[in-house]
Amino acid sequence: FRPSSPPAFDSPVFLAALAEVRQISDTRTPEQDANAKFWDMPPGTVTPPGYWNQAAAQLAVKYHLSEREAAHVLALMNMVGFDAIIASHEAKFTYWMVRPSQADPGIQVAIGLPNFPSYPSNHSTISAGMAAILGAMFPTERARLDALAEEAGRSRILGGIHYSFDNSAGLKLGRTIAAWALEHDVNGHEAFTLR
């Protein structure tokens, strides 16, 4: 599942992404700050997987899932969440991409700076993967869930700790893992659609 390599430090893509983070850092609005802090979810809080489990539980109630159906959704979604963090960290420690504030010390972060490499974004990978499972199970909710995953990823750029290419690679990686899981779901090799 490893994503392709991030852009080189001296490439136009890298420099543009770094400039975007610096521009946000220099002009961060209260709304951007609030968004970054909402999605921060550091250890000791609900965390991104906890957020998506809460969303799944709410959907299970909303659509009156049986215990078996709810268990299936939660199991498949959490399997994807675990695989997402493993795949994301495998890539992080393959590529060793520096954080924006390491590349430009003038960048002020709005949230905690994780002590591991930047590429790809864990939040993006986890959120895209878990949202994709929920979107497959609840197709009428797919657009809303995808938008939340995009927002979770974008929040890390707003917080000053990720580049846009970290986000896009994480979103793609999470969706790829979810697609693989849905294809190989033990329930007849395809996920059931609930609502």
How would you label these PLM feature ranges?
Residues F1-R195:
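Acidic/polar surface patches and capping/hinge elements
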